[in-house]
Amino acid sequence: MAQKDIGNKVPLHTLKKVEEVAAYYDEWALNNKYDKDMEAWNYTGPKETSETFNKYQKSKNIEIFDAGCGTGLVAVELKKMGYQNFYGADISQKLLDLAPQGLYKSLERIDLNKKLIYEDDKFDSVFCVGTFTFGHVKPDALDEFIRITKNNGLICFTINVGVYKDYGFDKKINNLIDDDKWKKLEFFKSNYLSSKDVNAWLGIYKVAK
């Protein structure tokens, strides 16, 4: 989640394999340390992204895919606003095990860099907060998010500024606009982990199929 390293044993940006990332987060989940750290570090990504999404989303009765959901921080914020139907996925089973019971309709251990198990147009909206960062999910995942999102649905995400250009997110986002796959509603820089001086680009895009 950090620009380079958030202080754990191994800098996240050095991890190359999916299973290494999964093991990193599994260890971080022990004794609920992940959630404790997020609270201590004033991690505002889930709240800010949810609030920005809520400005554009009218109906509360929608199905939301929470990609890289971790312990459920995004769904917790959305539930406060009246949303109820969440489907979560993450690479770390230990983080999934910490999600509040009953918060999600389903939870799946999934590598978001691969083709997703869901059918086309399955969800009304997709969230991916804190997952586009060093050693994690790559830009091509956006193609899958569009595939599983209904027309006019919203895709909401954060991208660590340290990987935005290096990983090619800038080109991917603009190519999807040029190809009429989605339209930009919001895109701005968020200081979403202020205590660690970590910034991210926060985007809200409407699917146009």
Residue ranges and their predicted role:
Residues 152-160:
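Conserved beta-strand signature within the Rossmann-like core of class I S-adenosyl-L-methionine
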Residues 167-188:
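Conserved Class I S-adenosyl-L-methionine
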Residues 116-126:
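A short acidic, Gly/Pro-enriched loop at the edge of an enzyme's catalytic core
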